[in-house]
Amino acid sequence: MKAGATSMWASCCGLLNEVMGTGAVRGQQSAFAGATGPFRFTPNPEFSTYPPAATEGPNIVCKACGLSFSVFRKKHVCCDCKKDFCSVCSVLQENLRRCSTCHLLQETAFQRPQLMRLKVKDLRQYLILRNIPIDTCREKEDLVDLVLCHHGLGSEDDMDTSSLNSSRSQTSSFFTRSFFSNYTAPSATMSSFQGELMDGDQTSRSGVPAQVQSEITSANTEDDDDDDDEDDDDEEENAEDRNPGLSKERVRASLSDLSSLDDVEGMSVRQLKEILARNFVNYSGCCEKWELVEKVNRLYKENEENQKSYGERLQLQDEEDDSLCRICMDAVIDCVLLECGHMVTCTKCGKRMSECPICRQYVVRAVHVFKS
């Protein structure tokens, strides 16, 4: 009976060791350390006292913000500096990923005036990403020179590769052209010979005289020429519509072009509509030209009246400004400054003045005056 209880207790302790860890069961064993019999525990060498340390993988972080990559912060490689950046610190441009620093310098086109406007921090970061030492740089100009020097070396390598590719493409195109020209020339002669045979067969089969045939062919060619001219005109109009910058810009009509009401009668319907449209006048219900002329006449008269009233208002405003106090620009000039005698302020401002604002003479007294 005691042996069965001992084996059952040992199996229970093994399960607790697997589930809770060896340390939890060892805490309970300390209470039974002095016990004897089936309650005495023996250490199991298969289980360690402390849990195994987790193996840490390489921690790859963004070069700009220093945050680790995740599902929401994906890793991208900059096409210029070949460093790892997250999606927030990189810019997608023309299917190429660049970091913010490389993109900023790429926007300047590596021109010295544009580079001098950048911050020193951005220039230093650009050089550090390319593992270029900047210990000898003391001024901003040194950083700019270093950037231009490095960019010049990179552009020369690009030019060498591009020139090599272009030379290869030129040689391949030369051989392909020479190869195909040897086979296209006999085929062209054969096609021309077959065309002459077909023309001879058609003329022999048809019993129409040669003069009639020549007249028919000339008429057909004239019709074809007319159709071609019309098609060319349509194509030119479409090209002008698609590329307005290539054609001469037509000057639109406006109210300033009218010197009197008599000029309105000589304008076309298109010009009248342009004038109304530029002045936000609706002409959707107008079906005849005289209706458009009436609207333009009314618009011209209203414009003349507005200009006259605006001129009168400006004149009155100038007169009012001449009579306002030069200090507060609110009250009317009603004060004489003594001893100089200038009238440039109101009574309230004149009493506060210590010297005249015009002649800088000391103000002895400010006298209030009345205008009749």
From Swiss-Prot:
Entry note about domains: The RING-type zinc finger is required for the ubiquitination of target proteins. The FYVE-type zinc finger domain is required for localization and may confer affinity for cellular compartments enriched in phosphatidylinositol 5-phosphate and phosphatidylinositol 3-phosphate phospholipids.
Pathway the protein acts in: Protein modification; protein ubiquitination
The record, for SUPFAM superfamilies, names:
FYVE/PHD zinc finger, RING/U-box, SAP domain
Q: Where is the composition biased (Polar residues)?
A: 201-220
Q: What class of enzyme is it?
A: transferase
**Role description:** E3 ubiquitin-protein ligase that regulates several biological processes through the ubiquitin-mediated proteasomal degradation of various target proteins. Ubiquitinates the caspases CASP8 and CASP10, promoting their proteasomal degradation, to negatively regulate cell death downstream of death domain receptors in the extrinsic pathway of apoptosis. May mediate 'Lys-48'-linked polyubiquitination of RIPK1 and its subsequent proteasomal degradation thereby indirectly regulating the tumor necrosis factor-mediated signaling pathway.
State its Enzyme Commission number(s).
Answer: 2.3.2.27
Where would you find this protein in the cell?
Answer: Cell membrane; Endomembrane system; Nucleus; Nucleus speckle
Protein name as annotated = E3 ubiquitin-protein ligase RNF34
